Amino acid sequence: MNFRDKAIILKKRNIKENLAIVTVLTQSYGIYSGIIKDLHSKKNTIIYQIGNIVDFCWSARLDEHLGTINCELVKSYSYLIMSNKRNLLYTHSLIELTLMSFKERELHANLFEKWLENLESINTGNINVKNYINFELLILKEAGYRLNLDRCGVTNCTQNLIYVSPKSGQAISATVGEPYKHKLLLLPKFLVHNNCEPEDIYEIQAAFNLTAYFFNKYILIKKKLPITRELLLKSILEYSF
């Protein structure tokens, strides 16, 4: 068995002096892992870095085997990721959530395209809170837990959406939600309107709380959110506004 595809390097784990297991997100086959040999060669040291886009080749005698991989570098983002603390936390938090949320060998084409989009945002210096939270919302959606934030789940109206139901994941308008607001999650304005950015640190905190609630409820269960996510939020709150 073998195939070739475009892929993004997500993880590398050394298992012997010159061997490692590398995990990638492929465009057409989902998350895949395999063994790389000659780990410390000059070429492989450059290729197998987190965030790099590669031409990925996987081969194994049987499909259920771990297999071996061979890659050629297509585009490197590793320097941009490693040279900036915010970029590093941003990327590693999303990698960990991706690996926690999806099984290997499940196709998620939208997820791959979102990863490409965000790597290019890092390249152009355009990463921000809105991009990050929208990525988390996409992960939830691809995992089968879409939040419906564009209209009220009770009245179907699209105005004054300021809450989210923790049960249904649907937006709730101010009028409908007022009697139950102590039981509802806050919905930041910038997640409803495309032309809005976070107004203050409270909106940022509310956005992180919103997605965290549904990750904990549906995906992580007894696992914990990545520590890199916590550090990213701390970094954002310290240096924003």
Swiss-Prot record:
It comes from Orientia tsutsugamushi (strain Ikeda) (Rickettsia tsutsugamushi). One of its GO terms (cellular component) is bacterial nucleoid. Involved in DNA repair and RecF pathway recombination. Signal peptide: none annotated. Belongs to the RecO family. The gene is recO. One of its GO terms (biological process) is DNA recombination. This is DNA repair protein RecO. Gene3D superfamilies: Nucleic acid-binding proteins, Recombination protein O, C-terminal domain. It comes from the Bacteria. Keywords: DNA damage, DNA recombination, DNA repair. It holds the Pfam family RecO_N.
